């Protein structure tokens, strides 16, 4: 009995120390991704992403992007958490799309296609969205999600690592410069890929970078770079982590042209 009590106490202490170090947001993400999801996979079969797609196919209306978004939001808020941009931050994204009306958008990180559907439904006629996804299983689900929403003609999925695909955009994908970039992939790639976009001449004066999850999990090096560089004019939009009451935010960084930067690598 004493040993059990001591063990429980040590586990509680370890949890509290982890919570203090990481914060509620990262601990919650870890719980959902590494504890809850494997259990659900075992009990329900398939993957979480496949279950999200199946829910959309069963509950959304084909050819209706808004109903697709609502079905994903309902599933992820009531059944299984997933790292989509979500409706709270999604409304901020909508406002940015409506303000700038981009004709060519690059998305880094497609996941299940939520943000691709969200952006593509608001793009003006003739506009296109290129979305990069390193995981071929996620890319396949994104394609099915776009097909179901009726947006397949507006979006092209590029499968591979962003650092490999970005240098190919001009020659292989007929890109001159980008009007908007949505960053929502690996957080440690935000800064390197921003630098790569600059180096490849893919940004023009007025190109909008919109970065998700800059607070949780967090992108401190990216924020330090864009906020400290005269090449960018930044605006922070405080919001909540998708499907949680945990503070997160989006960072908008509008490219002003080459300037002084605190980071050179």
From Swiss-Prot:
Gene3D superfamilies: Vaccinia Virus protein VP39
Matching InterPro entries: Catechol_O-MeTrfase_euk, SAM-dependent_MTases_sf, SAM_O-MeTrfase
Residues bound to S-adenosyl-L-methionine: 85, 107, 115, 133-134, 160-163, 184
Regions of this protein lying in the Cytoplasmic compartment: 1-2
PANTHER family: CATECHOL O-METHYLTRANSFERASE, CATECHOL O-METHYLTRANSFERASE 1-RELATED
Summary of the function given for this chain in its UniProt record: Catalyzes the O-methylation, and thereby the inactivation, of catecholamine neurotransmitters and catechol hormones. Also shortens the biological half-lives of certain neuroactive drugs, like L-DOPA, alpha-methyl DOPA and isoproterenol.
Membrane spanning residue stretches: 3-19
Protein name stated in the entry: Catechol O-methyltransferase
A GO CC term attached to the entry: mitochondrion
Keywords of the record: Catecholamine metabolism, Cell membrane, Cytoplasm, Lipid metabolism, Magnesium, Membrane, Metal-binding, Methyltransferase, Neurotransmitter degradation, Phosphoprotein, S-adenosyl-L-methionine, Signal-anchor, Transferase, Transmembrane, Transmembrane helix
Any Gene Ontology biological process: multicellular organism growth
Keyword Electron transport: no
UniProt keyword Cell wall biogenesis/degradation, yes or no: no
Binding-site list for Mg(2+): 184, 212-213
GO molecular function: catechol O-methyltransferase activity; magnesium ion binding
Cofactor note: Binds 1 Mg(2+) ion per subunit.
Catalytic activity: a catechol + S-adenosyl-L-methionine = a guaiacol + S-adenosyl-L-homocysteine + H(+); 2-hydroxyestrone + S-adenosyl-L-methionine = 2-hydroxy-3-methoxy-estrone + S-adenosyl-L-homocysteine + H(+); 4-hydroxyestrone + S-adenosyl-L-methionine = 4-methoxyestrone + S-adenosyl-L-homocysteine + H(+); 2-hydroxyestrone + S-adenosyl-L-methionine = 2-methoxyestrone + S-adenosyl-L-homocysteine + H(+)
Extracellular side: 20-265
Family according to the record: Belongs to the class I-like SAM-binding methyltransferase superfamily. Cation-dependent O-methyltransferase family.
Chain positions recorded as substrate binding sites: 187, 213, 242
Source lineage: Eukaryota, Metazoa, Chordata, Craniata, Vertebrata
Residue(s) carrying Phosphoserine: 260-261, 265
EC number: 2.1.1.6
Cofactor annotation: Mg(2+)
Enzyme class: transferase
